[in-house]
Amino acid sequence: MTNLRKTHPLMKIINHSFIDLPAPSNISAWWNFGSLLGICLTIQIMTGLFLAMHYTSDTSTAFSSVAHICRDVNYGWLIRNLHANGASMFFMCLFLHVGRGLYYGSYMYKETWNIGVILLLTVMATAFVGYVLPWGQMSFWGATVITNLLSAIPYIGTTLVEWIWGGFSVDKATLTRFFAFHFILPFIITALVIVHLLFLHETGSNNPSGINSNSDKIPFHPYYTIKDMLGLVLMLLSLLTLSLFSPDLLGDPDNFSPANPLNTPPHIKPEWYFLFAYAILRSIPNKLGGVLALLASILILLIIPLLHTSKQRSLMFRPISQTLFWLLTANLLTLTWIGGQPVEQPFIIIGQLASIIYFLLIMVFMPLAGLLENYMLKPKW
């Protein structure tokens, strides 16, 4: 009798995706983040579902319903802290996953990469609408500032903003629809993840060398299941440490005050994972220009495959491009720092320089470095 795992229509799909999947023998721990992101998504959907059972999406009760979850619901404080900090872990894994893709040339699998960029945008949208739900000061003003950016769109901008708000300001209608969006988007993300994996399994995984590994494959289970479990333990340990010892470390103190449309917080800023984009937005002293730069900072990922000039796929054997990659990393950390600072000197000029360097590195210096490295590989005699 043949193995049920290999014949049953449903089990067969799982088997080909997670058990008998041929994987390169040399993929490093940087390839763990895909599975970690899957775990993050699962944790977020589960904790989110339990929070939704007790949350009310009404301006008069939203803030107190979150307080009620933390005080009166069994382990409500834990569920809420896991959900809030789980979002941070999600973005940490996402940024490392994208960074891995950039470093090792994984973007050459264009369909997988493009679906990945769409996934990144969808997760960012989900996190944004989710941050509005507790209806604290930063929730309210964050929603006001970010939705207001759409008014920069010529001709239809103002109408579009009022349509999204469901009125003439961020109010009850906005909160209700944001809750609806926040509930549905994770399921859309799950569907996109399946498509992402579908395209990935058409080609198989890339590997650190960037060389075709068809001649040397090993089964995913047990080799990479056990390796992924190590990553999982480390991530869960980090998440639990953060959620149990310092749950409010990454949050904003202003969000402990209920939303008040008559009182603007001194510094409006998003969660840490949006600060780099927020810094780019603020670095341009023009509303439409800032919005376009903000969009470009993320959408630039879509043209990365077109900017690949090197004969080698990975940066593993390309020291000049490696240096530029780590400069880009440092630059993004600088932007993250600037996004959390007030709009005054010297932060303004640092933010503007970092924004220019960000686009220059990706669009000019890295493609040129690829060409230079190609030239250096040619025999000169």
UniProtKB/Swiss-Prot annotation:
A ubiquinone binds at residue 201. Its main location: mitochondrion. It comes from the Eukaryota. It is found in: Mitochondrion inner membrane. One of its GO terms (biological process) is mitochondrial electron transport, ubiquinol to cytochrome c. GO terms for molecular function: metal ion binding; ubiquinol-cytochrome-c reductase activity. Keywords: Electron transport, Heme, Iron, Membrane, Metal-binding, Mitochondrion, Mitochondrion inner membrane, Respiratory chain, Transmembrane, Transmembrane helix, Transport, Ubiquinone. The keyword Lipid biosynthesis does not apply. Its cofactor is heme b. GO terms for cellular component: mitochondrial inner membrane; respiratory chain complex III. Heme b b566 binds at residues 97, 196. Heme b b562 binds at residues 83, 182. Binds 2 heme b groups non-covalently. It is a multi-pass membrane protein. Pfam families: Cytochrom_B_C, Cytochrome_B. The chain crosses the membrane at residues 33-53, 77-98, 113-133, 178-198, 226-246, 288-308, 320-340, 347-367. SUPFAM superfamilies: a domain/subunit of cytochrome bc1 complex (Ubiquinol-cytochrome c reductase), Transmembrane di-heme cytochromes. Heme 1 (or BL or b562) is low-potential and absorbs at about 562 nm, and heme 2 (or BH or b566) is high-potential and absorbs at about 566 nm. Component of the ubiquinol-cytochrome c reductase complex (complex III or cytochrome b-c1 complex) that is part of the mitochondrial respiratory chain. The b-c1 complex mediates electron transfer from ubiquinol to cytochrome c. Contributes to the generation of a proton gradient across the mitochondrial membrane that is then used for ATP synthesis. Belongs to the cytochrome b family. The cytochrome bc1 complex contains 11 subunits: 3 respiratory subunits (MT-CYB, CYC1 and UQCRFS1), 2 core proteins (UQCRC1 and UQCRC2) and 6 low-molecular weight proteins (UQCRH/QCR6, UQCRB/QCR7, UQCRQ/QCR8, UQCR10/QCR9, UQCR11/QCR10 and a cleavage product of UQCRFS1). This cytochrome bc1 complex then forms a dimer. This is Cytochrome b.
